[in-house]
């Protein structure tokens, strides 16, 4: 049928049309199968789609008839494979089981002859570019159908292992391998041909059929089309990438997959040709009512953006397509040098931006748009009920975008980690090395290529602007994000100068400058924590998480004049409503203690008092114990006086809790609950036995006593004996046989097991001498 018959096909029910294609291919005789497939591949009426007109606001997507058609044809072929195999097996019952394999081979041969006939006709040169996509659609369906049938037969075989009746052999694996090779050949030709013709289109040397395809999904406002044969081919490749081994994909040029795949993924979210400006206008249509609740209409710009993203034919394939692009990045990363690989992921083709810069721009625009909207930081109960469906849809799109970005950048980071030199060698800083942003001096460098370090910094900047989404999964995000995040920081941590540069650049983005003097007040450069906006608070949390991992390599001046002034307000303004900012600041300080930074000596009085005041509102019992152990372990190597001062502060807090005489009902309730639960977790806010109700906090006196016992393995020999005396008194202060006493004795024994060689012998003697008294009545 000619192209003019396209409108007639549009009048047919889609299920009837593609169902009929699958039915006839499964039932026709072999010569007719060949003819039918040939017509299917070269049909102008089937593959010429109507013109699509996007709306004027730049956010409404054009229809995607080409992608829809290729996917539907693939599904029809998969159905035909299933039905043909069922027919072959039915005939084998009468003709013998060994005819089934021959019949299936002959049918697949007929399909392949029909697929190939268009490429070998007299007008092959004119037809070749046009038939490659239909050929790929047919092969994709056959591959999916055979793979699905193999899995189904394997499942049935496992279920009928003890059954005497054997299944009719079909040797599907040999047919799958044959189709895989043909599928890869056509995919490589399709992407290569479309790349060449796209270049001709941009250069003005386009023929009639090229212009026709360009118009299919294009628009009149200068946007690149999204419903092109190249993009449709990528959609088919994404559907079948898991069915083809990676080593078979070598004929496909990985740079084409990356160069074409990234813009396609961006187009799902309304980014065409690298133009991200439309993202800046999102979320601004959220409104606040008189009661302070936010609302977002379904027909608003943001609502339509979410709806159109989810209705995009590639939205459901964004995960497989991102993995396809990521695998291509990995393959290129293993063979390219540092400069070539960096160019691959930072410079796009045809003047467009590459993978990392494009994702960075998208993330930055979304970050600013979201953080300035009425939805930022607002829990569900502060959103109008009528808007819940729309905001839920928006969040689904946001999280899909985050997973897509994580998949792509994980491949970049993985390649850098794999190609980094091992072992890492460190060199003194050059005398003429330029200072970093903020005037921080250069630090020792390493033999890791600078382009790799810059690439990792760019990746971290992308996730800085996406942390408002990541943080919904918890302070550390989700598993694949954690792998990417900590792998990046691990490599940067091997280069002290890169650590300083990374923190300096992030600080510059936050608008935080160097504090001119160590004694200056933090408020001169940092907004008070209570007045921080959602954007500031989110960025500070991410900044502190990065600085925590790099703290050991940062110069003392940067720690004292930048990090502490940034995190201290979030420690002082400890609001349970902003737990993330407190926990990230708290973790950074512990990292400074672990690294033995000089500033921790003067910080100790403030920080220890803060810890003792933070239970149970901000810290659990386990967190409090871990923090005190970290502080004492760090101080015991540098200052005996501060170490013992910290121990005395814990003892004073215990004495104050005793003197304060906590309400009897609370104390007795804690004891009765402990007696009723022999496990006695002691962690504030943990899950109860039923998994629903939290376990009430332990009395402060008992939590501090457990922490004191844990300090036994953290002090040096100078204070060891004195601390044992205090722990002994705390044990005897509890009634014999009480659950509280059992917990303190158990924690003491655990701490003694961690003693080093200097204190182990004396600690064991002390335990053997007093353990009968400790456990009396147990």
Give names to the regions the model predicted.
Residues 34-35, 53, 57-553:
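Extended alpha-helical scaffold segments
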Residues 608-636:
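A cross-kingdom feature marking charged/low-complexity
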Residues 158-172, 562-563, 602-616, 646-655, ...:
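Alpha-helical scaffold repeats of the Armadillo/HEAT/TPR superfamily
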Residues 28-31, 718, 722-778:
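Proline-directed, serine/threonine-rich intrinsically disordered cytosolic regions
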Residues 159, 425-443, 667-693:
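Intrinsically disordered, low-complexity domain-flanking/linker segments in eukaryotic proteins
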Residues 1-66, 70, 74-86, 92-105, 134, 404, 542, 580-584, ...:
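Alpha-solenoid helical repeat scaffolds
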